[in-house]
Amino acid sequence: MAVLSDVIKGQREILGRVHGKDPAEIPQLWAVFTEVQRYYDKGFKVPDDVMLLFCDNNWGYIRRVGPWQEQRRKGGMGLYYHVDMNGGPWNDRWINTTTIPKLREQFNLAYQSGIDDLWVVNVGDLKPKELPIDFIMRYAWNPDAIQADETDDYLRQWAQQNFGEAHAEAISGLVARYSKYNLWRKPEVQSTNIFSVVNHCEADRVTDLWRTLAHEADSVGQLMPQAYKDAYYQLVLYPVKASAGVAEIYLAAAKNRLYARQGRVTANDYARRVEELYTVDTVMTAYYNKVLAGGKWEKMMSDIHSVSYT
């Protein structure tokens, strides 16, 4: 910590020489990321005029709130938040895995504790995270406008704004559920041992939830006017069906492994199902890349997602 203290002191001396003024008059922030927060928590002192930019845990949960001592800081406090994660142990880049209630909860915790001078959001490639970006921008504009029991209202308004009134209720439900299911287990972190294939029909129940959701998304999509088709595919249909496919790949692979160990010929049925789902994923991604909006968003959904990092 002594070395780090010398580094900050040296930086402030350089700022003072270059700008010809007291460093306390020059806006500065100190990013309290994962590898740095342990020093701060052990008592490392940061000049009072420097903003403290606290970071979440890389998976959308803030690490701390601002106690009263920090709320009085001249430099204030900010938050660095991830809706996209590129790094170990796993990425979270391919598709939205964050629910609106979770976002509202986490940003409200920050806001109510004085972490409100600056919010920086890691949004990755933008396209996969359009929904959480929209919510965060609206919430940042007026945190008091969206209460804890109004997140469903926000989703309906979002759906109505993008697709009209007729199907807003159905679409908001689809979006809420796929992001909730993805939050159970993010696609890039799926594995064959997450949901049990032997206890309480857990794997079967999860498979049924995803299949039902995908069927509903198809049904609503057939009712979409032509003008909304592309938007519906990229904001609703692809996230729902592609997420459902990845989830079922691992659920089917889990049964394949179990049944193979048991010497059951039905293990082959689940092996074929995995192959079918890979084909569906390839076809959907190709459509997104080459057909949707004339290929405007090519490669946006080509991130690795159906092969486990483990």
Task: Please name every model-derived segment.
Residues 1-74, 203-232:
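Gly/Pro-rich turn-and-neighbor structural signature
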Residues 35-40, 59-62, 69, 85-90, ...:
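Flexible loop/turn segments at secondary-structure boundaries
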Residues 74-98:
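Active-site clefts of carbohydrate-active enzymes
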Residues 153-308:
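C-terminal non-catalytic alpha-helical accessory regions
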